[in-house]
A protein has these predicted regions:
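Gram-negative bacterial Sec-dependent N-terminal signal peptides
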Residues: 2-21
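Extracytoplasmic metal-acquisition and chelation regions
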Residues: 20-211
Length: 211
């Protein structure tokens, strides 16, 4: 069974003692998650984005290059099956040896009830081409996620768009740093420092918006 289906706490337990000789290959499902992972990895490496910009995460067919990135990954960070149920099977098939983390299951994540008529479907991989300074905006700006298939939502009893909460984005930065540090202890200091800087950037953005 792929580790992607395990709760985050158990995945972390299984990960104990596992370290890679080089900087791990990392895959992220959508733009906002990519942006958070890229912020944590800044100066060390860069993740691969699984789904192209503007695609709906609810139904998607991987391009060959995206499937290869998933297959090559040592770690996979994705929102979870609530958002992309199809991706569970792809990870099971292509990345069965990867350590996959469903961020929506992370301790401290605030999950809301489904929101009717919400417009969330454009997932922009902020910073993919030029740095990653826009990741804080991914965490709170609903306008960056315009609808493409608003009438096709078939979510369960909770809203899978958890990255829109700045608090969740900050929680996930910590989770990402922890998982990367366990896989790559030599760069743990950089991962945690980057996560702290990312949290500070989000806090500053929220304060500016609320001012």
């Amino acid at each position: 069974m792929s580790r992607t289906l395990l709760p985050l706490s158990l995945t972390a337990t299984l990960m104990g003692g596992v370290a890679f000789a080089d900087v791990p290959r990392v895959a992220a499902d959508i733009g906002p998650v990519y942006s958070l992972v890229a912020r944590v990895m800044e100066g060390v490496g860069a993740p691969d984005l699984i789904m192209q910009q503007g695609a709906s995460p609810h139904e998607y067919s991987l391009r060959p290059s995206e499937a290869q990135a998933l297959q090559d990954a040592d770690l996979v960070f994705w929102v979870g099956a609530d958002l992309s149920p199809w991706l569970a099977g792809e990870i099971e098939t292509l990345a069965s040896d990867a350590l996959a983390t469903q961020l929506i299951e992370a301790v401290g994540t605030i999950v809301l009830e489904p929101r009717e008529g919400a417009l969330f479907e454009k997932h922009d991989p902020a910073g993919q081409d030029e740095g990653h300074d826009d990741h804080a905006e991914d965490a709170h700006d609903h306008d960056d996620h315009a609808a493409e298939d608003n009438d096709e939502h078939a979510h369960g009893k909770r809203d899978p768009h958890a990255w829109l909460s700045p608090n969740n984005a900050m929680t996930w930065l910590n989770v990402i740093a922890g998982q990367l540090s366990a896989a790559d202890p030599d760069n743990a200091g950089a991962y945690f420092a980057n996560a702290a800087a990312g949290r500070a950037e989000i806090e500053a953005t929220v304060a500016e918006v609320n001012a």
